[in-house]
Amino acid sequence: MLKVQQTADGTGKCLTTTMPIRRDTAFHLIRQYRPATEKTYTSVQIGINDSIEEFYLAHLNHSCEPNVIVDTKKLELRAIRDIAPGEDLTFFYPSTEWHMAQPFQCSCGSPRCIGKVSGARDLPLNLLGGYFVNQHIGAMAMEHLIGAQKLKTPIAV
């Protein structure tokens, strides 16, 4: 069902499907993974301090108009719209990554393109709120917001 192949522009690899996938379908269970000892270009953050490496996740590219959710609680890939055979499978990297090991300039071409992809930490909450984000990212965003609000509060002497 899942296939790793060369990207259309020939610059890398991508993950595609050989069969149609219907919206809201969990189509891959993430079970054959190993804990990542450090963040890498191919690791996926699944908790506040935990990242993993997995073959298919390593080939799942970013898009600001994704067709897949990486659900780090259920450890599954789920379609967020109908996906046709041969279509590149993509997810929104800040949905799992707070701070990325290797930020990059997005070239997805979407009207929703965020430009530099460096992790959820660097995105405004109103923009992040337009996407599915995993529980650990939501928790870290709230902690970040609360910390920023505390800095704005005058200190009584």
Regions found by a protein language model. Name each.
Residues M1-V157:
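Conserved catalytic SET/PR domain of SAM-dependent protein methyltransferases, capturing the structural core
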